[in-house]
Amino acid sequence: DTPLSITAVDASLLESRNQTDLAQIAAQAPNVTLNAMGGAYGSSLGAAIRGIGQFDFNPAYEPGVGMYIDDVYYATLTGGIFDLLDLERVEVLRGPQGTLTGRNSIGGAIKLYSKKPSSEGGGSVDAVYGSRKRTDVRASANFTLAEGLYGRVSGVLKRQDGYVSQMD
């Protein structure tokens, strides 16, 4: 039990809403703005919780919203448009989180938790093909390495041609 404002989204809810990247989570978390930002340093995440955050893609600035992947702090939101692949849950904690998560979370924190390997073997593959040769493949597999030792692998491939063909 956590005595704070939190929005938790589990894997089944992510799948049923067809949410595939982090910017789509803001639609179900009040007072949260997550925007995909283009920039010179790669695709960035503009994040603000309760009006506190950063919409500058410069990696020299530290964000006011903390990003954590499996409880490991992600120091910049540059490149922060993550595909929501093979996740157990996503948590959005609103308000200052310095006591719970540490530094750079004065506005709040976004926490991603990966699925853990288990004794149940299996996997999944999702594929999309669309206009301009768009190809999206998302796959994950769970397997046994040795008795009592399990592994999990997941990956994403995204490709799409542009609108214009270069004629040399």
Model-predicted regions and their roles:
Residues P3, A23, A27-V72:
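Extracytoplasmic beta-strand/coil segments of soluble accessory domains associated
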Residues S16, A23-A26, I81, L100, ...:
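A general structural signal for stabilizing positions within well-ordered secondary structure
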Residues G64, T76, L85-R94, T99-Q166:
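Outer-membrane beta-barrel translocator/receptor signature
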Residues A11, Q19, N31, E62, ...:
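ATP/adenylate-binding site constellation spanning eukaryotic-like Ser/Thr protein kinases
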Residues A8, Y68, L84:
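Short aromatic/basic micro-patch
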Residues D1-R17, L45-A48, V65, S118:
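N-terminal periplasmic "start-of-domain" segments of outer-membrane beta-barrel proteins
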Residues E15-S16, T33-N35, F55-F57, Y74-T76, ...:
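Short beta-strands and strand-coil junctions in structured, solvent-facing domains, enriched
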